[in-house]
Swiss-Prot record:
Gene Ontology molecular functions: zinc ion binding
Regions of compositional bias (Low complexity) in chain numbering: 206-218
Function: Probable transcription factor which modulates gene expression, thereby acting as an ASJ sensory neuron terminal selector gene.
Protein name per its UniProtKB record: Specificity protein transcription factor 1
InterPro entries: Znf_C2H2_sf (IPR036236), Znf_C2H2_type (IPR013087)
ZnF region ranges: C2H2-type: 260-284
Region described as Disordered: spans on this chain: 206-233
Superkingdom, taxonomy of origin: Eukaryota
Lineage: Eukaryota, Metazoa, Ecdysozoa, Nematoda, Chromadorea
Disruption phenotype: RNAi-mediated knockdown abolishes expression of sulfotransferase ssu-1 and thioredoxin trx-1 in the ASJ sensory neurons, in adults, embryos and larvae.
GO BP annotation list: neuron differentiation; positive regulation of gene expression
Record-linked PANTHER family: C2H2-TYPE DOMAIN-CONTAINING PROTEIN, KRUEPPEL-LIKE TRANSCRIPTION FACTOR
Keyword tags: Metal-binding, Transcription, Transcription regulation, Zinc, Zinc-finger
Length: 298
């Protein structure tokens, strides 16, 4: 021991000391010197290496260390990072399924498209191009056209068949249109005859229709309906309107046309509307009192 010198231990005040050491993913050293000054990371690393400070290095994944640290605070938890094995494709692909059986064992004709009636002729041969097939009269659809015509024909007299019933309907429409452009007659003798002698029932329908039309025209001219069909009751009685009715609109001056004047001597009021003239005449007869202006004292 005599001449051996003991290793010199640096003074506590002169040597810097470490206050904390932590790492997460990469090392970081926080060093304070004797003057309580912070060192930058580069100087701190050099100081740590010079004093041979052992670093806590780990070759494991930092995330696994964090999970292990969190498991300590959660009782009964078992969080592990493990790669799940790849599932085989047989589990991902759908399995084979049996064909869905229909509700009906024997499907109807509308289910099987091969049994549908052909709306248009086939074009395989030239002879079948011009052939028209009536799908309304087919057996599958029950013959809708023939049944409707037979139902109408059953309600007609025995002497009229289905074809004559269709002719009567078209003739009635023609007669109704002719009534719209001609004046109503008292009897059906002056109506142009468009029916044959065999259609006796059609003649009775035409005669009843003409009587209803003539009765409607007679009631409308009398003005007994809800709305008057004639404007004779609203005709103006002013002198200008009397002249136009007597001599015609071309016989009087153009300035008097459409103008209604008062016939009271000394008045001379002129209005563009007959309703205004009638209101003025009520003032002459005393039915309507004259409104006084605010400035008039009398």
């Amino acid at each position: 021991m005599g001449g051996a010198s003991s290793p010199r231990i640096p003074s506590r005040r002169s040597a810097p000391y470490f206050t904390s050491l932590a790492f997460f993913g990469s090392s970081y050293i926080k060093v304070k010197n004797n003057r309580n000054k912070m060192l930058n990371p580069t100087d701190a690393a050099s100081v740590a290496l010079s004093f041979s400070v052992p670093f806590q290095m780990s070759g494991e994944n930092p995330l696994s260390k964090l999970v292990e640290h969190c498991n300590k605070f959660v009782p009964g938890a078992d969080i592990k990072m493990k790669a799940e094995p790849a599932k085989p494709e047989s589990l991902l692909l759908p399995t084979d399924m049996n064909a869905y059986s229909p509700y009906l064992a024997t499907p109807n004709w509308w289910v099987d498209q091969t049994g549908w009636p052909q709306l248009y002729p086939t074009v395989t041969t030239a002879s079948s191009v011009d052939v028209y097939q009536n799908y309304l009269a087919s057996s599958q659809l029950g013959g809708l056209l023939s049944s409707s015509v037979s139902a109408v024909a059953s309600q007609l007299p025995a002497g009229i068949n289905a074809q004559s019933a269709l002719n009567i309907t078209s003739q009635q429409r023609t007669i109704a249109k002719s009534f719209q452009h001609t004046k109503p007659m008292a009897s059906s003798s002056s109506i142009p005859s468009v029916l044959t002698a065999s259609n006796s029932s059609a003649n009775s329908l035409v005669s009843s229709g003409s009587e209803s039309v003539s009765a409607r025209g007679t009631s409308g001219s009398g003005g007994t309906g809800k709305y008057p069909s004639s404007r004779t009751a609203n005709k103006c009685e002013c002198p200008n309107c009397h002249e136009i009715e007597k001599f015609g609109p071309n016989a009087i001056a153009a300035r008097k046309r459409g103008v209604h004047n008062c016939h009271i001597a000394g008045c001379g009021k002129v209005y563009n509307k007959s309703s205004h003239l009638k209101a003025h005449l009520r003032w002459h007869s005393g039915e309507r009192q004259m409104k006084k202006r605010s400035g008039d004292s009398s």
